[in-house]
Amino acid sequence: MVFVRSRLLMAAAALVMLVGATPWNPSTALATDSTKVVVKDFMFSPTTSTVMAGSTVTWTNLDDEPHTVLSDTGLFKSGAMDTNESFSFKFDKPGTYHFTCTIHPRMVGTIVVQ
């Protein structure tokens, strides 16, 4: 009985250590079908999203100021989005895509497509 209890305690401790060692970054998101990027407080959140090829990313402006989304290669470009307006783009090819707000160039983000 003591042996079984000891093994259960060791297994529980190992599980806690494994979960605690798993990195988690709140500024990064992973999605398979679609993901959302919130535009608020003059920043994109999350700043980096990782999605599977074929996924759609939707940016929604929750600021009181207009914002845009423009890829550094020109692959996708929104118009000015007012409060509560959205822009979506489907990412078909793997790669890393950087984007910015053309109105506020310090607002930047990245989409990683796997």
How does the language model describe each region?
Residues 2-11, 16-114:
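Extracytoplasmic copper-binding redox domains, predominantly the cupredoxin/blue-copper superfamily
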